[in-house]
Structures are given as structure tokens and as C-alpha cells.
Amino acid sequence: MYGLYQSPIRRSLQADIYRKPHGFIYLFGKEYFYLIKEKKVWPFIFREFQVMGLEIPDDRSKVREELKKVKYYFGKKWGNICFQFGIINEITSFDNYRARSQDIIGKVRGMRLQKRATIIKQTGLKLAFKENMPQSTITIKLAKSDEELLAEMNSGCADRVKKAIKKGVKVRLWTERDDAVFFEKRQNTAWGKGFHTITKEQYTMLLKILRKHDRGNVFISELNGEQIAGSICLFRDKTIVYLYGFTDRKYTNLWGHHYLKYGMFEWARDNGFEFCDLMGGAPTGFPEHPLAWVSKFKESLGGMKSEFYGSYDLVLNPVLYYLFKTFTRIRAKLKK
């Protein structure tokens, strides 16, 4: 997942399909793609900058020197609020199966808190108040038999996969006749969970590009011709990356979402992929995190969980940053 952020396919998604304002910046001897998020409050324009997939050197003096240059360049224009860095240096990684049998949650939480304090002290960055890059990801190694893939899951997840098979649920690849239903169910899932999704035009263009250039595909679980869950995936080298999908809540008792992931693992393995990246979740040891429920499901599938530094802000305008941070938190509370 974290290599995906600076990959050509993501640049194409953001620039050509989602048509987001963007730019390029050199940091630590490497070119990085970044997004520009503009908010217009007449007659002013406020901007946030965001680069994800950044790797920083261990020499923190070099980090401070580079950040100073970024602040000088981007801080000159009034209305520029902050530059957010999604940092992918790894804190630790561990086997999800091992995590279920050993009490390591508290240790991993402590490691993250210590790393946060060190980064803030050594670089002058602030912990981002809006998380745009997940702080962890779960990767499934696919060089296993069907039985081994099931055995790696927790007992509840494995049982649900078996029940879905007994109920007659099937997993297959998307076809054009699935287009309208998939999009509608994806929209319903997004609305039900309170987050935004892409437009129909962007969705159609995304699928067209993925299939035309063999950069990804769509997996669907169904019963008697009814779509009950779906996943859009990207292909990157020998890794298949889960992007997003839907689950039809009317059919939760069929466990199609669980079987969909298992079927996706089988297909990817049989088609030469070595890993499946489940595209992020909550940091370990933070049950209050909004992605905790997402992580719980993904962790039940087995694999390795990797913890990364996460997102930090370089403040460009302290007054605007404080006002924007306060406004964002108030708005989040009002939505609850």
C-alpha cells in the first residue's frame, strides 16, 4: 500500500481520473507527487498541501533542513495553511496470528507514542489533526494452499467463509453488466458510513483505465445473480491492492464480504501475485480510532500488520492553522 502512494498508477488516478490539483516536489533527493486542497471563502483562497508515501532519513538534521526549505517556499503566500507529510518509515510489523495469542497490543501502542514524541521534538512537525494516510496496513502472503489461507484467519472469519461456500455464494470478476448495480451499492455503502465517494463519471473512467491497461480489476461475490459484496483492486508489480468496495447490508447473513476476500486471495495467487495489500487501517492499541472497526475485519483475515509513522503537519501559517484546526474539530463534533 505505502509504495502505492508515489506510484505512477496513483498519480494517474489522482491527476487524470479524480482531476485533483497537484504538483511535484523534491525531498531528500527524490521527486514526490503532492496534492493541493483548496477551500474558497470569498474573497480568499486557503490551501493545504499533502504528500503521502514520504520516507525520511534517520539524520534528523537533514529533515529539519529540508523542512525549512519547504516552509520558506510554501509559506510565502498568504492563505497557505500547512503541508502534510504521510511518512512511511516503519515502526514495527508483526503476524496477526501471533497478535491474537500474545499480548503485544500495549507494546505496539507504547512504541507509537514514543515515536510520535521523538518526531515532534526532533523535527518541529505537529501530529496531523486530519489523518489522510492510514497509519497501518495488513498484507497477506499468497504462496499458500486454500487450507493454509483459511487456517491463517481467526476462527470466526474462517467459519464465515465456510458458511458462505455452503450457502452457494460465488466469487467472480466484474463484467460491464454489473456496472450500474455495483456503483449504486457502492454509493449506498458510502452514504451509510458517512463518507464521500467518487462520481459516476470518475468511477466509469477508473474501471475503463484499469481494465484497458491491466492495472486492476473488480471482484464480486453473488448469490443467484444478486451482488452482495464487491471490491475494486489495483495491480502493482506482484501485489494486488484492495482499493475500496461495498457490502449489501441486506445479505450480511450470507457472509459474502468474508468469502469475497478469500476468493480474491485465491484468484490473485493463481494469477501470479505474491501479496495482497488490504489498504490500511487503525494503529494498533487505539480502539477509539475511527478505522478500528475496519482493522478488526482485516486483521481477522490473517497476514502481517505493519505500523508506520503516520501523518504530520508542517505549519505554514500559525494563525490560519489554529483556526482551521478548531473549525475542523467543531464540524466533526456537529456531525456526530
Model-derived regions: residue spans:
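Conserved GNAT acetyl-CoA-binding A-motif
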Residues: K76-N96, R269-A282
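A conserved beta-strand-loop-helix scaffold within acyl/acetyltransferase catalytic domains
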Residues: M1-F44, T92, Q122-T252, W267
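Aromatic (often tryptophan-rich) hydrophobic motifs at membrane interfaces
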Residues: K69, Y73, M205-K208, R215-N317, ...
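Active-site-flanking structural segment that lines cofactor/substrate pockets
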Residues: Y26-L54, D59, R64-K68
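Active-site/acyl-donor-binding loops of N-acyltransferases
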Residues: Y2-R11, F24, W42-P43, N96-E147, ...
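Aromatic/hydrophobic pocket-lining residues that form the small-molecule binding cavity
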Residues: V63, L67, C157, Y203, ...
